[in-house]
Regions:
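Core beta-strand residues in small-molecule sensory/regulatory alpha/beta domains
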Residues: 114-117
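Beta-sandwich strand segments
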Residues: 121-122, 140
Length: 163
């Protein structure tokens, strides 16, 4: 699986690797809103750590749908997920998850995410890496050109907000 180092020459990353001005504005991102639901909480009454994984993946799903890349589901396994938990979120609280593409490698896609509750402070921050693996492939496969173009040029997408 391709989880190569960010200085890989064919990688596009925020702020370096290509020298292209404005590259950070070209990489896709999205903000989604959800509520902390009853099954999201633990015995202490605040959100369970595993809920952040679902919120990050829900943001990824919304982003890929917006980009017309829903067909990638099933061919982009996660190879890394990490999160730092900074604040509690409580049942019923509105939660905003921002997911940003930070790097597009030959076959990898790196995301960063931030989860906010109703306050300004981040409740969780983290990153996730997926790789492209075509059907029946035994490992990672390069992004098709059309997919790579979208992943490197689509820019911020409209938010998916609660009504």
């Amino acid at each position: 699986m391709d989880t190569s180092h960010p200085q890989q020459p064919d990688a596009l990353a925020v702020g370096h690797a290509t020298g292209t001005p404005g590259l950070a504005q070209q990489l896709p991102s999205i903000v989604i809103e959800r509520r902390v639901e009853w099954p999201d909480t633990d015995a202490a009454g605040h959100y369970h750590h595993s809920t952040v994984v679902r919120w990050a993946e829900a943001a990824e799903a919304a982003l890929l749908r917006r980009l017309g890349l829903a067909h990638l589901f099933g061919s982009t396994p996660r190879v890394r997920f990490e999160a730092d938990y900074r604040a509690r979120l409580w049942f019923g609280e509105r939660v905003r998850t921002e997911l940003r593409v930070t790097r597009v490698g030959t076959s990898s896609l790196h995301y960063a995410f931030t989860v906010h509750g109703e306050g300004e402070a981040a409740a969780a921050v983290g990153r996730m890496v997926v790789v492209h693996s075509a059907a029946r492939a035994t490992g990672s496969t390069p992004w098709p050109d059309g997919v790579r173009d979208v992943l490197t040029q689509a820019g911020p997408q409209p938010p998916e907000l609660l009504a």
